[in-house]
Structures are given as C-alpha cells and as structure tokens.
C-alpha cells in the first residue's frame, strides 16, 4: 500500500465523519480520530511488509528439543567399564631365574587386578574386549663373538576358540655388526626391544612374552624387563 493511498483513505474518513458545530472542541476531536486512524493503517502496512519480505518471522529454537540425536554419539565414546574395575596386569622379570624369562607379580611396581591371572608364566584374560598388550626387554653383552648374534622378543596368544599359539607382536635385532678383533677391547653393548599393540581378546585367552636369548638379559636395574595388559 502506497503513501498516497493511505492519505486518500484518511481524507475519505474525515469526509465521512459528521460535521458538528461546537467550535474548536469538534475540530480537535476530528483531528485526533484522523491521526489515530492514520497510525493504525501505517502500523498494519509496516508489519505486513516486514513479514512479507522476511525481515521478521517466527522465532526458531536454537537447540533441538530432543537431545537423543546427540546422546548416542556421546555414549559411543564412553566405556561400559569404570577405570577402577578394568582388568589390568603388570608383571616383572625374576632376576634370580637364570637361563629363563620368568614373570613375577609379587614384586614392587607389579600388579594383577580385576580378574587377570598369572598362570604357567602366562597372563590369562578375564573378560572379552579390547586390550593394550605391551612388553619390554633389555639385552646386554660384552663384545661381539664370531657367530652372528640375533635377539628376538615375541608376544604370543593362545585363544580359547582355536587353542593354537599365534604371534601377535615380534621383533628381531642384531647388536653386533662385526666380530670384535682379537686383542681389542670388548666393549659393552645394550639392545632394548619394546612391543605394544591393541587387540581384541576373548575370555580365557592366554598371553606370553618370550625371548630367544635369556642369557643376555640385563637385570641391573628394576623396571627394565616387564610385561602387561590393560583393558580399554
């Protein structure tokens, strides 16, 4: 609606009003009614234009009423277990076991918790799930012999479903590139091997960490040779 149309409507409304003789009081009343009518028409026209062109509109909700669309994603990232009841184990090597790698849990900084067992030098998994499996060994030698030295470290699994020993993680290292010359000083060497990975395990699975040359193990310091699992 244009401005000329609004003015014409106001003039028609003034002509339609009955003319009264009463002096200034009647004129003021007519002026008030005319102004009031003009404001109503102008306000309605402005509101229509704003709604029509989308300047204003119905308020939209900033947040969805139903948060169930978000909750599954948040729940997916959380574990059904609390940190206090997750199976965990950390065993250390027995420094007094000559010629073999024997794991112990009754030592400082060693533990078995929430169902994990140490049986026949193997860790027994108490429940199905994802587990972090890790182990470290440290080899030490003096000089290099004429024969090539190969050091291996392997983590194996015997699953309850097929009862076959399968290597999960394995590494091979050779600390000596050449033989120590005759008459030369035999210098010491150190060779650490660390293994770690995440695997899906079943209840009752047995895990072992083994080496091929226990005679080269270094037990000089605690915390150098260990084996463990952590439920995720």
Curated annotation (Swiss-Prot):
PTM summary: The soluble form derives from the membrane form by proteolytic processing. The membrane-bound form is further proteolytically processed by SPPL2A or SPPL2B through regulated intramembrane proteolysis producing TNF intracellular domains (ICD1 and ICD2) released in the cytosol and TNF C-domain 1 and C-domain 2 secreted into the extracellular space. The membrane form, but not the soluble form, is phosphorylated on serine residues. Dephosphorylation of the membrane form occurs by binding to soluble TNFRSF1A/TNFR1.
Keyword field contains Phosphoprotein: yes
Lipidation (N6-myristoyl lysine): 19-20
Residue(s) carrying Phosphoserine: 2
Molecular function GO labels: cytokine activity; tumor necrosis factor receptor binding
Glycosylation positions in this chain: 79
THD domain ranges (all copies): 87-232
Gene Ontology BP term (one): positive regulation of canonical NF-kappaB signal transduction
Disulfide-bonded cysteines: 144-176
Residues the record marks as site: Cleavage: 34-35, 39-40, 49-52, 76-77
Membrane topology: Single-pass type II membrane protein
CDD domains: TNF (cd00184)
GO terms for cellular component: extracellular space; plasma membrane
Keyword Transmembrane helix: yes
Entry's family note: Belongs to the tumor necrosis factor family.
Protein name: Tumor necrosis factor
């Amino acid at each position: 609606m244009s401005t000329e149309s609004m003015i014409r409507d106001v003039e028609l409304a003034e002509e339609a009003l009955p003319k009264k003789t009463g002096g200034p009081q009647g004129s003021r009343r007519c002026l008030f009614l005319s102004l009031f009518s003009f404001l109503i028409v102008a306000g309605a026209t402005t509101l229509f234009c704003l709604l029509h062109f989308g300047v204003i509109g119905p308020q939209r909700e900033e947040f969805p009423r139903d948060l169930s669309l978000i909750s599954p994603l948040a729940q997916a990232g959380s574990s059904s277990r609390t940190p206090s009841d997750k199976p965990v184990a950390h065993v250390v090597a027995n420094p007094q076991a000559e010629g073999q790698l024997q794991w112990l849990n009754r030592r400082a900084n060693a533990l078995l918790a929430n169902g994990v067992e140490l049986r026949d030098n193997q860790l027994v998994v108490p429940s199905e799930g994802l587990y972090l499996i890790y182990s470290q060994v440290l080899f030490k030698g003096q000089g290099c012999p004429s024969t090539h030295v190969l050091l291996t470290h392997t983590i194996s699994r015997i699953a309850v479903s097929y009862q076959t020993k399968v290597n999960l993680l394995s590494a091979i290292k050779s600390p000596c590139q050449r033989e120590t010359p005759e008459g030369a000083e035999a210098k010491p060497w150190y060779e650490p091997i660390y293994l770690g990975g995440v695997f899906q395990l079943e209840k009752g699975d047995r895990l072992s960490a083994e080496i091929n040359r226990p005679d080269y193990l270094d037990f000089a310091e605690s915390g150098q040779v260990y084996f463990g699992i952590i439920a995720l």
